[in-house]
């Protein structure tokens, strides 16, 4: 789930993010200015090992296999989705020994001992501003035929915006892009051979809600503004810090 680490740093949960260049296509490192990027994994891990003595906690997002590179009492694990769904039983068993968080509630089925930590929303960037019209759904290129068909069966007027390497919307430009529209369809799927609808709102769906769009879900309902409080970055980070300290 892109940008979670940077947003959490912005609101007080650390001051540095280490990231592979290939994983930040939306420019979070440029917007928040807390990220060191690396061309290869070996360089990233070495840098993390070199600086870990200066930090009380090492927060690892998704890639739990690297927990063994750091003192056990410092490691905190946060999982976001696809990577966790693909973990084998041995790795799932091993993470039980660490503080674990998941950013969507369905992942509690895999890690029932984890704590649900909603994905944070930066409300300084995403402020109510909508003046647009029409319908938009931002979704993936993978299995597009299946995903687009399912969405348009319920929302026939929606424009399907395919997010791929050539059509990435920069993070700082997302408010302006979304504000062109009045309605956002927030319907995401697993990457299974037969995709399954995901139950929780996506980061983009919450961002659209904060901008004042009407956000529609997979069941034909709309997202409640109360979700903005649940995902508010200040509250999310405070809860996270309370849990790990």
Residue ranges and their predicted role:
Residues 48-49, 81-101, 179:
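Membrane-proximal helix-turn-helix segments that form the acceptor-binding/catalytic region
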Residues 171, 176-181, 187:
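Short alpha-helical donor nucleotide-sugar binding micro-motif in glycosyltransferases
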Residues 119-174:
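Conserved catalytic-core segment of nucleotide-activated headgroup transferases in glycan assembly
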Residues 97-127:
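Donor nucleotide-sugar binding/catalytic pocket of nucleotide-sugar-dependent glycosyltransferases
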Residues 64-67, 76-90, 106:
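A short, histidine- and acid-enriched strand-loop-helix "catalytic/donor-clamping" loop
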């Amino acid at each position: 789930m892109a940008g979670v680490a940077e947003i959490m740093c912005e609101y007080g949960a650390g001051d540095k993010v280490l990231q592979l260049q290939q994983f930040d296509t939306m420019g979070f490192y440029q917007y928040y200015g807390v990220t060191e990027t690396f061309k290869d994994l070996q360089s990233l891990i070495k840098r993390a090992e070199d600086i870990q003595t200066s930090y009380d906690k090492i927060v690892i997002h998704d890639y739990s296999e690297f927990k063994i590179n750091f003192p056990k009492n410092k490691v905190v694990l946060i999982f976001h989705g696809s990577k966790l769904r693909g973990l084998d039983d041995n790795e799932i068993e091993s993470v039980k020994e660490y503080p674990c968080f998941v950013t969507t509630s369905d992942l509690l089925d895999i890690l029932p001992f984890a704590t649900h930590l909603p994905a944070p929303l930066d409300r300084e960037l995403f402020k109510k501003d909508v003046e647009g019209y029409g319908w938009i759904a931002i979704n993936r290129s993978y299995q597009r035929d299946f995903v687009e068909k399912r969405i348009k069966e319920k929302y026939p007027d929606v424009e399907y915006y395919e997010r791929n390497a050539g059509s990435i919307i920069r993070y700082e430009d997302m408010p302006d892009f979304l504000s062109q529209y009045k309605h956002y369809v927030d319907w995401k799927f697993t990457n299974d051979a037969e995709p399954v609808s995901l139950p929780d709102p996506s980061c983009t769906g919450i961002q659209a809600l904060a901008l004042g769009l009407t956000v529609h879900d997979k069941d034909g309902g709309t997202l409640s503004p109360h979700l903005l409080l649940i995902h508010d970055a200040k509250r999310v980070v405070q809860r996270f810090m309370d849990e790990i300290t």
